[in-house]
Amino acid sequence: MAEESFYGVTLTAESDSVTWDVDEDYARGQKLVIKQILLGAEAKENEFNVVEVNTPKDSVQIPIAVLKAGETRAVNPDVEFYESKVTFKLIKGSGPVYIHGHNIKDDVEVVDMEEDDEEDDVAEDEEDEHPKKRAKIENAADGKNAKNNKKK
């Protein structure tokens, strides 16, 4: 069973960046799940507030929320960050912007998903080859029978 805890941070003009990092002392899989990003009630009217995420492990640096008082006060990105340090930064606006979600520590060891995907692809390719061969054989048999039936 996984250990789950609440994660919440506030970004403002004075404190515009926060970083979440995996617990090095925890040997099993960890992930951060961001469920919602909210614009605070004190936010200035007609000011865009843009939150950017940066994951150095995957070289990702992209805005994940654009909020504006009077228009969009909340987004539900439902994004997950596995085994990677993540930095959230308020790159435009003065906030406050609230980010919350879950920090999940698995009891099961994390397996490299890319290796599993490659193994699955190979197995699927092998399965796909056999039906195609059977179909060709069946079609060839049908074709011969059809010609023989026409000659009679």
Curated annotation (Swiss-Prot):
GO biological process: chromatin remodeling; sperm DNA decondensation
Subcellular location: Nucleus
Keywords for this protein: Nucleus
Task performed by this protein: Binds to core histones and functions in the ATP-facilitated assembly of approximately regularly spaced nucleosomal arrays. May participate in parallel with other histone-binding proteins such as NAP-1.
Subunit structure: Decamer formed by two pentameric rings associated in a head-to-head fashion.
Family according to the record: Belongs to the nucleoplasmin family.
Protein name from the UniProt record: Nucleoplasmin-like protein
Native organism: Drosophila melanogaster (Fruit fly)
